[in-house]
């Protein structure tokens, strides 16, 4: 006969696996106290920045030059290579967000022919690339 502890452990593993499959892979990375600490740090940084901006605005009474300064040039993000954005969805997520994905596709490509961009069967692991066949 199987011991009660073994049955309880198997039941706990089974319930945990079911809950994990229902959350669609959402796992909190930070604890509540860590989030509070990070928010407090951001507030402190924002307060310090607002003070330094106010001091700079008081000191800079002269009009700004038409050309950007070296500091502003360095502050801009410049892309050196093309950026590719993608995502992976399982069949359940595809069905759940199908209407929103189709609307987004129509917004980006209004003149494209209306055709589904994923398999009708909702194959798992679809990544957006066309199949090699």
UniProtKB/Swiss-Prot annotation:
User: Quick one: where's region Disordered?
Assistant: 38-78, 105-133
Composition bias (Low complexity) maps to 118-133
Superkingdom of the source species: Eukaryota
Q: Which InterPro entries match?
A: Motilin_assoc, Motilin_ghrelin, Promotilin
Its signal peptide is: 1-25
Q: Which UniProt keywords apply?
A: Cleavage on pair of basic residues, Hormone, Secreted, Signal
- Which Pfam families does this one have? Motilin_assoc (PF04643), Motilin_ghrelin (PF04644)
Give GO MF terms, alphabetically.
Answer: hormone activity; motilin receptor binding
Q: Which family does it belong to?
A: Belongs to the motilin family.
Q: What is this protein called?
A: Promotilin
Upper taxonomic lineage: Eukaryota, Metazoa, Chordata, Craniata, Vertebrata
The UniProt gene name for this protein comes to MLN
């Amino acid at each position: 006969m199987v011991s009660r502890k073994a049955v309880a452990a198997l039941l706990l593993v089974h319930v945990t696996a079911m809950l994990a499959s229902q959350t669609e892979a959402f796992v909190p990375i930070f604890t509540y106290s860590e989030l509070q600490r990070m928010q407090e740090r951001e507030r402190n940084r924002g307060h310090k920045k607002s003070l330094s901006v106010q001091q700079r605005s008081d000191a800079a009474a002269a009009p700004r030059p038409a050309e950007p300064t070296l500091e502003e040039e360095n502050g801009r993000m410049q892309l050196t290579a093309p950026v590719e954005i993608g995502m992976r969805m399982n069949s359940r997520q595809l069905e759940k967000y199908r209407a929103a994905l189709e609307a987004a596709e129509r917004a980006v490509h209004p003149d494209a022919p209306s055709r589904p961009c994923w398999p009708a069967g909702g194959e798992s692991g679809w990544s957006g690339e066309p199949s090699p066949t």
